[in-house]
Amino acid sequence: MKRECHLQWYNYIPVIILYSAVIAITFGSLFSLFTNTEMYFIIRLFLFIIYIISLGFTLHYHYKCMTISNIIDYGDDNTLIVTEEKDKNFCKICKVNRPKRSHHCKVCGVCNLRMDHHCPWIANCIGEKNEREFIYFLLFCAITCFFVCCLNFNNFFAFLKNRGLLQEINYRDFIKAMTICSFIISLVVGLTTILIGAHYLLYNVKYNITSIEMFIYKNFSECPDYENDLKNNLLRKIRPFPFSFIENYFREADNINEELNYKNFSEENIKLLNEENNMIKL
């Protein structure tokens, strides 16, 4: 049986605010492209093109995070409809025995597979199926904000240098104010994204735990013994890569490692067999 989340209209207000900020930043960056005379136009054009490309990736992964569902349906494997509590994985609201590491979201009103947290900026829960998209969303969001700050850097410091910028309100001053707002918003959003992303990658990915589990277990020594390898956990979560040539490179590396492991395994077996044969002869 298909289940749906029960979000209200006000749950989408943060998403509307986010897209409004994107529109304001884009207009401010566009104004800065033609008004920032202290930077060469070719450099401004390059920064603006990179900004548009990274913004496209950011919006793409934001849309993926919003639309990919982690909801546990009644027909999922290891999910059973029951009328009484049987174990700790039982959800009293949904009346189902959930798969391990699943949790009920009070905002969505449903249980989610390996739920990490509910993100108001995407109006959806981050879980098993959209965790990869969330990591790439944070990455490209930070890259986008970085290039916006570079594009509007000179206008912002021109404002600090000339305090009388907005004393006479005219069209040119409005344009400069837009670029300054773009710089400030991008700086705040970028730093926030970097801090959240760094915390998420260093702790959640390294210890292979969710944000909910991090709050449940007050220190990492109490966490279940999941695989605690940052490189392997990170590669497992972000693959397949968004660019095919990067994915092909890692696939070739995986094949080489598998061949080496097989070769080493075979050599060890040969040594053991030779030792056993020598023991038998003796």
Task: Name each region found by the language model.
Residues M1-L282:
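Membrane-associated feature with strongest affinity for ZDHHC
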